[in-house]
């Protein structure tokens, strides 16, 4: 009985110490899921050959697409990278005369999930107020001339987060594989630019900036 009691006490001390000095590495290594890879890594190295002229038409977001965010947390000097993801992404792009004429991307912010439900609840209710602002969007504002089927382009458009719109120029990596257009982007954002307070998770400090991440698999 004494041995069992000792084991219970040890477990309680270890878990309770997550927020204390002894806990940073335990928190990072055992209580936080390893961060997902960047969306750019999803673009296949095995690209199919395609002529830009053959990309003409309207393409729609298909299965396999996702969006979300990447932020860094700091616990007593120990860095932890957190990624949140949702598959509830919609939108389309239009290619005409070897030019990206239009693009609209919409994601359901309330559906973004990480490995921690409490973090997700804070994200929805306190940080982004998803009951008021359920969507985040990106809308292309300037046409982009396309010279390759697979390349990286700087694209200018309006991003809306938390009801706040900002004009941004973002890098988008493109590819073509299995008759699908692939688009990937990691967009640096500073929370205060969108009237969002950096999430406060008690013993964990969340940095005041992060990335919006998007991977799109588009079909005609």
Regions found by a protein language model. Give the residues of each.
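Low-complexity, acidic/polar, glycine-enriched regions of mature
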Residues: 2-220
């Amino acid at each position: 009985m004494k041995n069992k009691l000792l084991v219970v006490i040890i477990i309680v001390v270890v878990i309770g110490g997550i927020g204390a000095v002894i806990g940073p590495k335990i928190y990072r290594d055992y209580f936080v899921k390893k961060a997902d890879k960047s969306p750019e890594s999803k673009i296949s190295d095995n690209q199919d050959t395609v002529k830009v002229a053959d990309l003409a038409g309207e393409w729609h977001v298909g299965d396999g697409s996702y969006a979300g965010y990447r932020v860094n947390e700091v616990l007593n000097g120990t860095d932890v990278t957190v990624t949140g993801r949702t598959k509830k992404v919609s939108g389309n792009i239009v290619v005409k005369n070897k030019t990206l004429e239009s693009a609209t991307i919409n994601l359901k912010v309330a559906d973004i999930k990480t490995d921690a439900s409490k973090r997700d609840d804070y994200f929805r209710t306190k940080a982004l107020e998803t009951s008021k602002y359920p969507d985040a969007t990106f809308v292309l504002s300037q046409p982009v001339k396309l010279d390759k089927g697979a390349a990286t382009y700087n694209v200018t458009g309006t991003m809306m987060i938390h009801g706040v719109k900002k004009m941004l120029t973002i890098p988008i990596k493109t590819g073509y594989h299995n008759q699908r257009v692939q688009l990937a982007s990691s967009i640096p954002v500073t929370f205060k630019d969108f009237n969002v307070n950096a999430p406060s998770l008690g013993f964990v400090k969340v940095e005041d900036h992060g990335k919006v991440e998007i991977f799109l698999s588009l079909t005609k």
